[in-house]
Amino acid sequence: MTSIIGAALPYKSPEKAIASSSYSAENDSSPVDAVIFAGTSLVLGTACRYLFNGTRVPYTVVLLVIGIFLGSLEYGTKHNLGKLGHGIRIWNGINPDLLLAVFLPVLLFESSFSMDVHQIKRCMGQMVLLAGPGVLISTFCLGALIKLTFPYNWDWKTSLLLGGLLGATDPVAVVALLKELGASKKMTTLIDGESLMNDGVSVVVFQLFFKMVMGHNSDWGSIIKFLVQNSFGAVGIGLAFGIASVFWLKFIFNDTVAQITVTLSASYFAYYTAQEWAGVSGILTVMILGMFFAAFARTAFKGDSHQSLHHFWEMAAYIANTLVFMLSGVIIAESVLSGQTISYKGNSWSFLFLLYLYVQLSRCVVVGVLYPLLCRSGYGLDWKESIILTWSGLRGAVSLSLALSVKQSSGNSYLSSDTGTRFLFLTGGIVFLTLVVNGSTTQLLLHLLRMDTLTATKKRILEYTKFEMMKTALKAFENLGDDEELGSADWPTVIRHISSLKDLEGRQVNPHDGYEAGSLDPTNIMDIRIRFLNGVQAAYWEMLDDGRITQCTANVLMQSVDEALDLVSTSSLSDWRGLEPRVHFPNYYKFLQSKIIPHKLVTHLIVERLESACYISSAFLRAHRIARQQLHIFLGNSNIASTVINESEVEGEEAKQFLEDVRDSFPQVLSVLKTRQVTHYVLNHLNGYIKNLEKVGLLEGKEVSHLHDVVQSDLKKLLRHPPSLKLPNVDDLITSNPLLKDRSSFRSLAIGETDA
């Protein structure tokens, strides 16, 4: 990490750290033993994931406890763990900077890339409040309480250093639980986004106070300069890497491995460039990079590539979290068992529990002070959500790594060894207590606040879906129950093995009961609108995979659905409202009247805008038609379904009229667009046909590879050189263009250019 004057923090190198561990070459240890600890951690992590699945105990809490148990066996008993113990000591001796550089880029990029862009934009104000003023309030609250009540005779700088160190939150357990329980997106986005931001801010605050503790005097000017450079420098580097990576992805066609490699390498290079070369916050840099990818590169990954990308990052984050929390447990055990100052002097255990109370109190102060502003920004915040937000302030790997750096940098006139040991002990204890107490009781708190209960509408949807599942099961039994070779199956035995359908057997239930009586209930209508818009968005994704729309068009369409989802409680379907400006010419097109602009450029801009409008309108109509069909199949002719379907049909009138105008004025535009879509569809169909021939064994690998390359080459040519529209006469183009509402000025432009 880089200080405010550009010097590196005095961390020990990995070689020195390992050499200072209590093991040596005499114990027959080998660097390869580090692999044993990593492998054992993953095996134990997999077992815990299976055994504790469906329980109230978060996965990360179990890993932390196991890590403490292994560390206690290795450091607290005469009988060490052999090769596994050697591996534990190697990992425990790794430089904290190296730990952050290895694990943080993966965890930060996965979290920021997986967040919903629209949710981020709406919650950004709340996230900045909690990560900016919130971290400062927490730092000074904790620092003041530590200075005034702890008996360690620390000065204000040292007390504030510990306060800033404990500012970094890591709500992995809480966020995973909220997602599992189906909590609102805004809540998970706010907690996750705040964690990402305040990790970066906390590290910057930590660096600032660390340099002060180490004797570097800084005036207010240098402090402000340092904070500004770290913040804006991180944003700039993150955006630069994001733009370069997205630009690179445009040249990679249907190569999932290469695409994933670009995202992985970009996250590590961005972190290293920011942290080591530019001296700014690597955490903020990777967070900005991930959000940029989420905003502009999500549609670059289609079909299998999209799934493979998310599966890769989920797996990478799972492995990183497993290793981080196992190692955190080992570090906590070692800090408690190997420090005589902790074990025998100062009543440090009682002060640890007191510090835990201070951490919770400071979190309450942060949320309480900022509550009026949090309620008025983004999606707002009610009192129940504020309680969960307060309780979700868990501490994790970042705080622990910073405490390790303090311990390794201690032992001098500025920072005593006892202080470094106490920092690690107190931080490790807070990490353990927040994970075990807060993490394990979050589900109970959600239950007490009744935030985990399903609404009446959702319950009816579940009951109806189970009823439809029974019908689907009966159809499947009719198709497969009687086999030519084996004979018939026993339906009662089949149904006994399908526990989800046992309660429905024999019940004559109209699946639409409950909707008629409550069809005018705003909550019911809002719920169905949300499901309808989710169906529209799913149709857009399918059209993107099929080549019916471009990446740029897909981004516009997805954004319109996100904006409409925010308004479902107060108005009817409104996703066309967000697309309407894209279908008409914006005001800045009036500058096309200038004779300075070349004739061909004017024609190209107008045709490009016209094609984009046709793509948007046709995709909108198709997606709504698909969603209406799905909703009708799902809810039948119920009043509530008819209400939402009517809203959809009303929305589509303007899009239909626009395409009719284009068909009358420039039918060749629609013909070219349809030709592109059909060509892309045929090539995709051929690709699927080749895969199917391989699947049934009619083609061998070499033959499949040859045919696949030929089809992929054609697809690449289609995307780079699609069928183009023969440019019409500029006078006809402008005067007949259905996009133009005021055509007189464009007519004069056209006539002027024609005369010229």
Curated annotation (Swiss-Prot):
Catalytic activity: Na(+)(in) + H(+)(out) = Na(+)(out) + H(+)(in); K(+)(in) + H(+)(out) = K(+)(out) + H(+)(in)
Stretches in topological domain Cytoplasmic: 53-56, 111-125, 179-194, 249-251, 298-311, 372-385, 444-756
Membrane disposition: Multi-pass membrane protein
Domain of life: Eukaryota
GO cellular component, as recorded: plasma membrane
Subcellular location: Cell membrane
Keyword Transmembrane recorded: yes
Known glycosylation sites: 27
InterPro entries: Cation/H_exchanger_CPA1, Cation/H_exchanger_TM
Family: Belongs to the monovalent cation:proton antiporter 1 (CPA1) transporter (TC 2.A.36) family.
Protein known as: Sodium/hydrogen exchanger 8
Protein source organism: Arabidopsis thaliana
Gene: NHX8
